Amino acid sequence: MALFPVASEQPISRPAIANLTIIGLNVFMFLLEIILGDSFINSWAFTPAHLTAFFNGTGSFQAVLTIFTAMFMHASFSHIFGNMVFLWVFGQAIENAFGSRPYTTFYLVCGVAANMAQYLIDPNSTVPNLGASGAIAGVMGAYLALYPTSTIDLFVWPLSLFTHRDIRVPAWLMLGLWFAVQVTLGGNGMTEAGAAGGVAYFAHIGGFVTGLVLALLVRPDERRLLSAA
């Protein structure tokens, strides 16, 4: 069984241009991966051991750049498709809350925090990390902080195919359970992105916590409005 968010009830007051641009950049980078192959992926994915080598004075500055480039890369079509669906559903509301430029900065900060969280777990790992999941987890954390009672429509595979309807759940339930799963799997010894099918659980945890905390700090007015509603 697989769950995908397909819609949020949170009203969107203006087009989420930055979010669409980020989605476009992810698609562009994925096309480059297909065209240029493994050499491009290995050069621009984030490998913790390469960053450790840079800190030790034996590596290239490119290792620092990969902290950013890796968050726009993906391992497969299903990987990028799933990530972009989550980003589309949750990113629009967060961009509307923050504004386009602050949202872009917020997204990048969450992505960096996610990669560094994974790095701290195993700084000598030679497994390349790639994917927008950590940055998107930050967007999800912000959504939980700002709109916990908003309703999320979930497509449940294969149930929704037979019932022809989605399941509606409050954001706090869906996002809270999602985070609990990441913590549980991360705590079961998942110390590398290459473990358990290539999922960087600690990147998800780091990104989510960063996004949640930043949203609570930057947008206290949103929380006051929610409390008064």
For each feature predicted by the language model, list its residue ranges.
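A detector for small-residue-rich transmembrane helices and their helix-helix packing motifs
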Residues: 1-229
